[in-house]
Swiss-Prot record:
F(1)F(0) ATP synthase produces ATP from ADP in the presence of a proton or sodium gradient. F-type ATPases consist of two structural domains, F(1) containing the extramembraneous catalytic core and F(0) containing the membrane proton channel, linked together by a central stalk and a peripheral stalk. During catalysis, ATP synthesis in the catalytic domain of F(1) is coupled via a rotary mechanism of the central stalk subunits to proton translocation. It comes from Polaromonas naphthalenivorans (strain CJ2). F-type ATPases have 2 components, F(1) - the catalytic core - and F(0) - the membrane proton channel. F(1) has five subunits: alpha(3), beta(3), gamma(1), delta(1), epsilon(1). F(0) has three main subunits: a(1), b(2) and c(10-14). The alpha and beta chains form an alternating ring which encloses part of the gamma chain. F(1) is attached to F(0) by a central stalk formed by the gamma and epsilon chains, while a peripheral stalk is formed by the delta and b chains. This is ATP synthase subunit b. It is a single-pass membrane protein.
Length: 156
């Protein structure tokens, strides 16, 4: 064979190989490469989407935490106010009860004082009558001199 015919035959075989490769080998390879590229692109898109969703979820969580903190602070302040109100009410009731007890004790003391004064007047009147009886050396009749004794009580 001649170089020219060999070269020509090699060129024909090469062309057939190129055609066969382009027709039967290359499309599945490009299809597999395209599918792989699509999977990678989908994975990257899913990763970006997940990243944005994570960022959004973190923002929502932070917002919820802030809301929860403010709500908790509000509830604590409200509970503190209620506690102070209850304490103030209890103090006011205690002061009111103490004032009632003091007023009752003062009234009872005044009543006891009046009773004691009356008892002292009675005793002083009896002592005065006994003293007068001893001075006069005669008996003073309490029934007869009741008017005199009552005036003596009022004067004392």
């Amino acid at each position: 064979m001649n170089i020219n015919s060999t070269l020509f035959l090699q060129a024909v075989v090469f062309a057939i190989l190129v055609w066969f490769t382009m027709k039967f080998v290359w499309p599945p390879i490009t299809k597999a490469l395209d599918e792989r590229a699509q999977k990678i692109a989908d994975g990257l898109a899913a990763a970006d989407k997940a990243k944005s969703e994570l960022s959004s979820a973190n923002k929502r969580v932070e917002a919820e935490l802030a809301t929860s903190r403010t709500e908790t602070a509000t509830r604590l302040a409200d509970a503190d106010r209620r506690g102070q109100g209850i304490i103030e009410d209890a103090k006011a009731r205690a002061v009111e009860e103490a004032n009632k007890i003091i007023a009752a004790a003062q009234a009872e003391a005044a009543q006891q004082s009046v009773k004691a004064r009356e008892a002292l007047r009675e005793q002083v009147a009896l002592l005065a009558v006994k003293g007068a009886e001893q001075i006069l050396r005669k008996e003073v009749n309490a029934g007869v001199h009741a008017d005199l004794l009552s005036r003596l009580k009022t004067e004392l």
